Structures are given as C-alpha cells and as structure tokens.
A protein has these predicted regions:
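Entry/capping segment at the start of metal-dependent catalytic domains
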Residues: 2, 8-100
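Extracytoplasmic
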Residues: 62-64, 77-81, 90-95, 110, ...
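C-terminal solvent-exposed extensions
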Residues: 71, 100-102, 111, 239-313, ...
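Extracytoplasmic/secreted envelope proteins and their assembly/folding machinery
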Residues: 80, 124-132, 147-151, 155, ...
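Second-shell loop/turn segments in exported
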Residues: 113-121, 135-141, 195-203, 223-224, ...
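Amphipathic, coiled-coil-like alpha-helical scaffolding segments used for oligomerization/assembly
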Residues: 121-178, 243-260, 265-268
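Flexible, polar/acidic helix-loop-strand segments at domain edges
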Residues: 155-242
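BRCT (BRCA1 C-terminal) domain core and associated BRCT-interaction motifs
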Residues: 342-404
Length: 406
C-alpha cells in the first residue's frame, strides 16, 4: 500500500470521526434545547395551574365570568343544570336554572335537544358545549356533582335547614310540613322522593335549588362556618368531591367569596320556557329571551351603573318592601318562575299569602310568580319579563288587580 493510499484512508477516517462528533454535538445541542423548552413548558404549566386564575384576572378588570354546574342523580340521570355568572370583585353569583327537559341547541341551524338526551349521548361535555352554543357565552368553569357528592358536601357544612311544603312519608324519609334539618343522606332521599312522586322536571330543579339556597343561608348565618370556609382542609374536602376544571387559585377565590357572602351574594332565576309542538321545553323566543336574561343578570351581578336598554316589548315590575311569603321562608331572593300550573295546585298561592305576592294570570292560570322569603331582607325587588309573553294576561299585586295592555 503506497503512502498516498494510506493518507486517503487516514483522511477518510478523520472525516468519519469528525462527522460522528458533529452529529453527537448536534444531538447534544438538540437535547439541551429540548430540555430547556420542556423545562420552560413545565414552569409555565405549573405557574398557570397553581398561580394564574381567570377569576383573579376578571377581578382586576372588573369583569364577570360564566360557569355551568350539572347535577346528576344516582342513576346517572341529570336533575338539571345551572348557568351561572360570577363577579369576584363584587362577591356576587347569579344562576339560572335549566331543568333536565330543557331543549338546548348543538347547532343553531338544527332543532334543539333536551338536556337529559344530550347527557345520555355525549356525557357532561356534550351538555356544556350545548349550553355554550345556546347562550353564545364562553363557559370558564364546568362543574359536575352527583348524589354522593351532594350528600358529602352537605355533611361537610353541617347540614341544611329546609322548609317542607307537603307531608312526606316514604322509605327512610318522614317529615311533616314545616322547617326541618337535613343531613346529606336525608337531602338526597328528599330529591329521590321528588322523582318517585313524579314531580315535573322544573319542580325537581326548584327543590334542588332550595338545597343550594338554604346551604347559602346556613353559611351566611353562621360566622364560624364562614371562617371554616377559608381553611385548606375544607377547601380540599369539598373540591375533591366534584368534577371540575377549577384550579387551586380559582378555588381559593371562590371560597373567599363564600366566606364573605351575605344575603345579596346569590341571585337565583329560572329560564323562561314553554312546551313546543314536540313536547320539548324550549327557551322562549328561540332562545333570544334567555340570552337577554343572561345579559341583564350579568349587569346585576357586576353592579354595573348602567342597566341594559328596556325596549318597547319589555315590562318592569318593582315591588317595595316585599317580605314574608308563608311557606317560602327558605327563599333568599326574588325568582321569576315559569310553571304553567293551575291556581292552587301546589298551594303556593293560597288566599292566605296572595296579599304578599305578585302573580301574573293568563286565561285563568298562574303563569309567573314573584316571591321572596323572610330571610332575604330585601326592600326593593326588580323583575322584568317580555311584554310579548303577556298577551291576554292580568297582574295581581297583593290585592290589587292590573290589566296589562300592549
């Protein structure tokens, strides 16, 4: 082998070694860069998860956020849902009840589908998506709670006081009419009783609503419980029992709201709806009234100085010094109900308490009722509905009778 050949082989070997070193260096550099990117990504994720909160940002910007809660029974069937608005700046929460047979839109071009059917086919994600499409609002927090979790949470706050409007005697549940104290298992049995008795979906939702409202009243009236709400143990105990996308900083702010709540913290309303030709409970005016209801409640929750414009088709009702409705002392705020029941069917509008309530009657049937309870201590009540709903209707305010003209 001559010297030239040996030199070429040596150069080839050197080139190969240099190429291997270069490739190794590239891999090392790529590994370092990937490690840095992964490290930065982990830091950003940890910061976002443990320190960043949309509620904190909304508080700084004086904005309101939207959330949704889905309640599910032991048979994995929804009781119903609530669309909610929260202001972390003003410590106020507004919720609108959605019964399980309310029709929601998956697509505005298609027909609406009942909430319980959406849950049956696509689970809670399908329900939350339909609520977003129906309302046109981005839901920041999505929460699901089942019967066991309802029971555990009620036990954690020491129980809830309820007003029973009719005598109950079934299985392990036996109560006379009047105020009763429920532990978690009794509360769940009470909700089961409503299903067994065949209550309408909207009425079952009202009773669930009563549990929520009375739990809030219990917190308001118990300073010790309010302070307990700030403890890490109670936060972890309650939040571990719900399925949600709430993160630690969100939970901290939410429990601060509960720890500083008062009788004006929670505002509860019900969606206005009517049965369509398919037998589905459908938001009135193809959902536009629901969106307006949300916008008005958002302004109220955010304590904005300007109210939404009242158009010609809107009608307003102001009741001064309205307190104390017999049998409804567990209500914390005014409610605007769609019921469609005949007068006296549930006994909420008997002659004894008619003088303390405002009702709208159409064609001899009670269409809506405006009521507050003794606990709320509200001097001024403001309610609004759409004038187009009031064809052929009259308003009875106390013992006074008003015709509603177009």
């Amino acid at each position: 082998m001559n010297k030239k050949t040996q030199k070429n082989k040596k150069n080839h070997k050197d080139d190969k070694s240099l190429k291997s070193i270069t490739q190794a260096n590239r891999k090392a550099i790529a590994f370092v860069i990937s490690s840095i990117i992964a490290g930065v990504g982990i830091i950003i994720f940890l910061f976002y998860y443990f320190f960043y909160s949309d509620l904190k940002k909304a508080k700084d910007n004086d904005e309101e956020l939207y959330f949704a809660i889905l309640f599910i029974d032991e048979n994995n069937i929804p009781y119903g849902a609530y669309f909610g608005i929260i202001s972390s700046l003003h410590n106020r929460i507004g919720i609108i009840g959605l019964p399980k047979n309310i029709g929601l839109w998956k697509n505005k071009n298609d027909k609406n589908i009942p909430l319980n059917k959406l849950y049956e086919t696509g689970g809670r994600d399908e329900v939350f998506k339909a609520i977003e499409i129906t309302t046109g609002k981005k839901i920041s927090y999505k929460i699901a709670v089942d019967n066991n979790q309802i029971s555990d949470i009620i036990d954690l706050i020491g129980g809830v006081r309820m007003y029973i409007e009719e005598a109950i005697n079934i299985d392990n549940l036996s109560f006379d009419v009047g105020e009763r104290f429920f532990q978690g298992d009794k509360a769940v049995s009470y909700l089961n009783y409503l299903t067994i008795k065949g209550y309408e979906e909207i009425e079952t939702l009202y009773r669930l609503e009563d549990l929520i409202i009375n739990a809030m009243i219990g917190i308001i009236q118990n300073p010790e419980l309010k302070s307990i709400m700030l403890s890490k143990d109670i936060k972890n105990a309650i939040t571990s029992r719900i399925k949600s996308n709430l993160r630690p900083p969100d939970i901290k702010i939410l429990f601060n709201i509960l720890a500083n709540c008062n009788e004006r913290t929670l505002i509860v309303e019900s969606i206005d709806a009517s049965m369509d030709e398919r037998g589905i409970l459908t938001p009135i005016l193809e959902g536009s009234a629901f969106i307006k209801q949300i916008n008005d409640l958002t302004l109220y929750v955010g304590l904005k100085t300007q109210k939404s414009e009242i158009e010609n088709e809107d009608i307003s009702l102001i009741v001064l010094n309205a307190t104390g409705i017999g049998g409804l002392a567990d209500r914390i705020s005014i409610r605007m109900r769609y019921r469609g029941f005949k007068a006296g069917e549930y006994g909420n509008f008997s002659k004894n308490n008619l003088s303390e309530s405002a009702v709208i009657i159409r064609n001899g049937q009670i269409e809506k009722g405006f009521m507050v309870g003794r606990e709320c201590r509200i001097n001024r009540i403001y309610a609004k509905t759409d004038r187009r709903l009031l064809n052929n209707a009259v308003l009875i305010l106390g013992n006074d009778y008003y015709e509603i003209t177009r």
